[in-house]
């Protein structure tokens, strides 16, 4: 994609009167944002803009310096993707209202990796935390990227677990993604770690105000980047349910973790299941529903045959983390023997050591 269309697209995106639908109209009508920026009022009207929007563009040309704005973005190490270019996420482009412009910090290639969204309440219980840790770990070791917001609670826990398991985290923000704008500030350090292994994403340019309505609008991107959306703990009015609604509208799978009928943060997830969301008790439920198990099995080297002891141990492992103490009790073998078998199986690519004595089966 030509640099000029990005420079002028970024400038147009700073005009508050132009939302994503109007920007997409300009892109489709003029084919590039540079031509749209230089267009006169008559052509802008033909592109479908209102008189108020046209006046806003005329006024913006007098106060905005597109090249200067672009240089500010480069200094903040922010990449920009325009709908239709090679690295723009293909799943997101399939949705009804894809953002014409995405700002990215980190690895843009991650945006086209197979991903599942994991969202939920800020008021996470211990049950929700454990569910997030175990299910996300199982997805990550099966080479699935995790998409979420950056809110504390389930969102942050999903991203932290992804990082702890050397996965690919994608955080979609409702604010600009330069360091001073990252929100919430309590997760600033988490955001920096995400940039190293995955990416931060937003449709908002530098200097954009963080408004309340940004958050539900942002949720369409979380769902749009993902093959499916998992909700772990959500009350009836939780924003996570908005993400699930977007996923349904985008014809994507919706998954939910059931919870106690006495827990307020399980009312939303239990209701989703009543409405037809797929009940999830482990990461395998998601892998199976998305028809990914066959793909995962072919990824490992099938030429390395296992011994009888190795096969015996593998039978007691699954796609969910199993602690070595539990494994030793199940297989009724000495600790040293089990440790040796696990080491060999990891070398063969059959299992993964998640740390903390936890192991998962890779195929």
Regions from the PLM with identified roles:
Residues 1-86, 256, 350, 355-358, ...:
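Short, small/acidic-rich helices and loops at N termini and domain boundaries
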Residues 2-5, 82-363:
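Glycine-biased, small-residue-rich flexible motifs in mid-sequence functional cores and linkers
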């Amino acid at each position: 994609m030509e640099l000029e269309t990005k420079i002028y697209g970024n400038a147009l995106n700073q005009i508050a009167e132009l939302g994503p639908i109007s920007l997409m109209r300009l892109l489709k009508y003029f084919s590039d944002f540079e031509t749209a920026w230089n267009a006169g009022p008559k052509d802008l009207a033909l592109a479908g803009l209102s008189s108020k929007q046209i006046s806003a563009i005329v006024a913006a040309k007098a106060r905005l310096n597109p090249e200067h704005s672009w240089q500010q973005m480069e200094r903040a190490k922010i990449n920009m993707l325009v709908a239709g270019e090679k690295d723009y996420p293909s799943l997101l482009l399939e949705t009804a209202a894809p953002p014409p412009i995405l700002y990215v910090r980190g690895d843009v290639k991650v945006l086209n990796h197979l991903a599942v969204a994991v969202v939920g309440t800020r008021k996470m219980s211990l049950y929700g935390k454990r569910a997030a840790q175990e299910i996300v770990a199982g997805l990550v070791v099966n080479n699935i990227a995790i998409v979420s917001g950056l809110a504390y609670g389930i969102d942050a826990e999903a991203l932290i677990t992804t990082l702890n398991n050397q996965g690919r985290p994608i955080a979609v923000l409702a604010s600009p993604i330069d360091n001073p704008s990252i929100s919430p500030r309590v997760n600033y350090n988490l955001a920096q770690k995400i940039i190293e292994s995955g990416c931060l994403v937003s449709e908002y340019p530098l200097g954009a105000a963080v408004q309340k309505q940004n958050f539900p609008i942002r949720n369409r991107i979380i769902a749009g980047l993902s093959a499916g959306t998992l909700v772990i703990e959500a009350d009836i009015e939780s924003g996570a349910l908005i993400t699930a609604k977007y996923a349904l509208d985008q014809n994507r799978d919706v998954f939910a973790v059931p919870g106690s009928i006495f827990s307020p943060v399980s009312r939303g997830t239990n209701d989703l299941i009543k409405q037809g969301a797929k009940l999830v008790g482990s990461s395998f439920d998601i892998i199976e529903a998305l028809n990914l198990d066959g793909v995962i099995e072919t990824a490992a080297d099938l030429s390395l045959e296992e011994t009888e002891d190795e096969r015996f141990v593998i039978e007691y492992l699954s796609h969910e983390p199993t602690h070595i103490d539990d494994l030793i009790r199940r297989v009724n073998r000495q600790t040293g023997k089990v440790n040796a078998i696990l080491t060999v199986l990891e070398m063969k690519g059959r299992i993964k050591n998640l740390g903390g004595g936890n192991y998962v089966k890779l195929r």
